[in-house]
Regions:
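Short amphipathic alpha-helical surface patches that mediate protein-protein
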Residues: 139, 217, 416, 474-477
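SAM-dependent methyltransferase catalytic region
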Residues: 2-247, 251, 263-279
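Selective for proline/serine-rich intrinsically disordered segments
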Residues: 7, 177-178, 302, 365, ...
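Short, amphipathic C-terminal "tail helix"
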Residues: 470-489
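Short, solvent-exposed polar/charged micro-motifs at secondary-structure junctions
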Residues: 157-163, 256-260, 341-344, 481-483
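C-terminal substrate-recognition regions of SAM-dependent nucleic acid methyltransferases
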Residues: 45, 49, 170, 251-471
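Alpha-helix boundary recognition
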Residues: 235-239, 416, 473
Length: 489
């Protein structure tokens, strides 16, 4: 296998610059028009096959994050296991055409083009229509070359695709793609999170030191988490490898780029052990470059089973270090359903939810185990995690909220602070609901050492910098939800 050197990649954000570069990169206007036309996905195709065509600017932005040496190595093998019409490999083709132009033996444009198409690029696609479109586009690039694209199911247990390429190749150096997220349905229908299987099998295809370059949803950033339906801990798999780069996208930016309502990341994983596992000094650590959901760039030492937040990485790192030392605040998830089972109860009040209009109450004839106990009740469902201090133990609660029983003075200050809402939003990796993993970043603050009086003292205790404090005070990162302290049914 040809050795891939680990030079530092060039990093840029998706911007007008990337958009212009991706468009000018593709010289053939017919190909550019076809790709642009195919970006508009029919609803039926999206639901049945999970099709989402990746825009050129996103592909370009992702591809140039790879080490520069990959574009100058004519021996590397590239694969896209869910290639669609081939738009990702079209961008890769043009980048290789540019990168190999000064390499001896590949200076002739036609010969270079033929070599790239026949010996470097490999594609697997499930839909025959897409395969035909892909072959058509590569024929426009070089009509004497035979592209390596097969119509097959990459996830087929029999792995029939392995016998279908002409040279029977089964190992690759770069696996780049945007695999389907769901198949045979959207929302609550169909097979969910199928991208996890693509990612796991995709890593298995790689030679040592090869690269997985994938776009997919971000649950892999949650530590010790079995992804729904897939029942795999992708965090454990990725973080034990060397993660080169992560870029996060908001729901709004993903909608604009790919016309889907979800947040996604793209991630570059090198198929080698995480060097931080054995690092015995600061000189030996490896830091991953991360562009967070707010567009801020960070360097982070990723260790196995690490939670990777949406933003505020340096702040949450400090919080986690204190949590490891002092322990974390205990968040209670109730399993008591009596408030909804017993109808017509009038004796005991149970908080079912909190909105801006007030506190939603369910009544029961059976007391909750935390009735008559002082506690903090946090709205667990929805965008706003309202905090109610039940000082006199008036309420129980249903399955929707979460609670902190008998909070200490320092816990009260922390949970009622701006910092708490900053942490909650930084850890909302999936949807808008409260993430129980937030407790990783909610440290116990020992009252024997300090009694926190205000947020300034809290910031000083945590040793936050002026820049970090400004981030917490910045309303663009989160909102502090207010609600009427009135009971509603």
């Amino acid at each position: 296998m040809p050795k891939i050197k680990s030079n530092t990649p060039i990093y840029t954000n998706i911007s007008t610059h990337s958009n212009e570069n991706s468009k000018t990169l593709i010289k053939n206007k017919t190909i550019l028009e076809l790709i642009t036309q195919k970006l508009i996905i029919r609803k039926s195709e999206k639901e049945e096959y999970g099709e989402v065509f990746t825009p050129l600017e996103m592909i370009y932005d992702m591809a140039i994050k790879l080490p520069k040496d990959v574009w100058k190595n004519p021996q590397l093998k590239w694969i896209d296991t869910s290639s669609g019409i081939g738009n990702i490999m079209i961008v890769v083709f043009y980048l290789l055409m540019d990168g190999l132009k000064d390499i001896d033996g590949y200076k002739d444009e036609q010969e270079r083009s033929k070599h790239i198409i026949e010996n470097m690029l490999y594609m697997i696609e499930y839909k025959e229509e897409n395969v035909a479109d892909c072959k058509y586009m590569f024929n426009l690039l070089n009509d004497s070359a035979n592209p390596n694209i097969i119509c097959a199911d990459f996830l087929d247990r029999g792995e029939k695709w392995k016998t279908m390429f002409n040279n029977k190749i089964t190992k690759f150096d770069i696996n780049i793609g945007n695999p389907p997220y769901n198949i045979e349905g959207t929302k609550h229908k169909g097979i969910k999170n199928v991208y996890v299987a693509f990612a796991i099998k995709g890593l298995e295809l790689l030679n040592p030191d090869g690269y997985l370059v994938y776009i997919h949803p971000p649950p892999y950033r949650i530590s010790h988490h079995q992804i729904q339906c897939a029942k795999e801990n992708l965090n454990a798999i990725y973080t034990t490898k060397q993660i080169i780069y992560i870029k996060m996208f908001t729901v709004e930016s993903t909608k604009k780029l790919m016309n889907i309502m979800m947040n996604v990341d793209y991630i570059i994983v090198k198929n080698t052990n995480n060097p931080n596992i054995l690092a015995n000094s600061m000189e030996n650590i490896y830091e991953t470059t991360i562009t967070d959901i707010k567009g801020e760039t960070h360097k982070l030492k990723i260790i196995p089973h690490m939670f990777i937040p949406n933003f505020g990485i340096s702040i949450l790192k400090k919080l986690e270090q204190i949590t490891r030392k002092n322990g974390n605040i205990n968040i209670i998830l109730t399993s008591e359903k009596h408030a909804q089972i017993i109808k017509g109860g009038t004796q005991y009040k149970n908080v079912h939810g909190i909105t801006s209009k007030g506190i939603k109450i369910c009544y029961s004839d059976k007391p909750h185990s935390l009735h008559n106990k002082r506690k903090l009740i946090i709205n667990g469902i929805g965008s706003y995690n309202y905090v109610l201090y039940d000082e006199f133990g008036e309420f129980g609660f249903t399955q929707s909220p979460v609670a902190i029983n008998e909070p200490s003075p320092n816990t009260l200050k922390l949970i009622q602070s701006k910092l708490f809402h900053f942490i909650v939003n930084a850890t909302k990796i999936i949807g808008n609901n409260f993430n129980i993993k937030t407790t990783l970043f909610l440290p116990i603050i020992d009252e024997k050492k300090i009694i926190i009086q205000n947020e300034t003292e809290l910031y000083n205790y945590l040793k936050l910098t002026k820049k970090e404090i400004a981030m917490i005070e910045n309303k663009d990162y989160y909102s502090i939800p207010a609600f009427l302290h009135e009971e509603i049914n």
